[in-house]
A protein has these predicted regions:
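Residue-level signature of catalytic and energy-coupling elements of molecular machines
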Residues: 44, 69, 84, 112, ...
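VWA/integrin I-like adhesion module and closely mimicked acidic/polar interface patches used
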Residues: 57-60, 80-82, 89-149, 167
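Short beta-strands and strand-coil junctions in structured, solvent-facing domains, enriched
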Residues: 11-12, 31-33, 91-93, 120-122, ...
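C-terminal signal-anchor/stop-transfer transmembrane helix together with its immediate cytosolic
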Residues: 176-211
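Active-site-proximal beta-strand/loop segments in catalytic clefts of secreted hydrolases
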Residues: 25-28, 86-89, 115-118, 157-160
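Scaffold/interface architecture of coatomer-like assemblies
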Residues: 44, 154-155
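Membrane-embedded segments
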Residues: 1-80, 95
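Juxtamembrane amphipathic/hinge helix adjacent to a transmembrane helix
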Residues: 157-189
Length: 211
């Protein structure tokens, strides 16, 4: 089903980051820290599997999620703080504007790689499943600005093959073997099923490098 396919995409990303500390941030109308940074990917996978327990409404607080990830990385070494943001790019909730959140991230040494998926009123191909993404278009320009202001990269994915290629490129940009800390796409607890069904959600993961 759609939810299982969505989790599979994120689980695959985790598998690619052996050696990273990974933590989950969940968000809908607000952002919440679900797990601390950890090298125990199995526990994060378990949390990912259990992450959707309800709905927080048709909303996505991108700015708040960026701010929370930035806060979680403040105690990590300078130069190794990375946020990989996987989202439809439509900010519909929260108290902090994404552009302002990006500036805060930059000022705290956090680099953001923004990955836009779905949107355009079409469907996202996930392991052969066509997942309807709703009528909202992805705010590519906004995501490009978020990535640019923090010294990161912007990527566009419309299917899982594209996501796989993007993950590989990000892996090359942020090698696991390097010392330091990183933040990976955060994950949102309540709106996850709605995110994939309507294309208005945000998926993200907080990751910190192993020293």
């Amino acid at each position: 089903d759609r939810l299982t396919a969505a989790k599979a995409v994120l689980a695959d990303f985790l598998e690619r980051r052996a050696g990273d500390r990974v933590g989950l941030v969940v968000f809908g109308e607000r952002a919440f820290a679900l797990t601390p940074l950890t090298l125990d990917r199995a526990s994060v996978q378990e949390q990912l599997g259990d992450s959707v327990v309800g709905l927080a409404g048709r909303a996505t607080a991108i700015g708040d999620a960026i701010a929370l990830a930035t806060k979680r990385l403040q105690q990590q070494p300078d130069g190794q703080r990375v946020l990989v943001l996987l989202t439809d790019g439509v900010n519909t909730a929260g108290t902090l504007d994404p552009a302002k959140a990006a500036r805060i991230a930059r000022d705290n040494g956090v680099r953001i790689h923004a990955v836009a998926f779905g949107g355009d009123g079409g469907a996202l191909s996930v392991f052969g499943f066509q997942l309807p993404m709703g009528g909202d278009e992805v705010d590519e320009a906004g995501l490009q600005r978020i990535a640019a202001v923090t010294g990161g990269r912007f990527f566009r994915a419309r299917d899982t093959d594209a996501l796989a290629g993007i993950y590989a490129e990000i892996d090359a940009l942020e090698p696991v073997q390097r010392q330091g800390q990183a933040v990976r796409p955060k994950i949102e607890r309540y709106p996850l099923p709605l995110a994939w069904a309507l294309g208005i959600g945000l998926l993200a993961l907080v990751v910190g490098r192993r020293r």
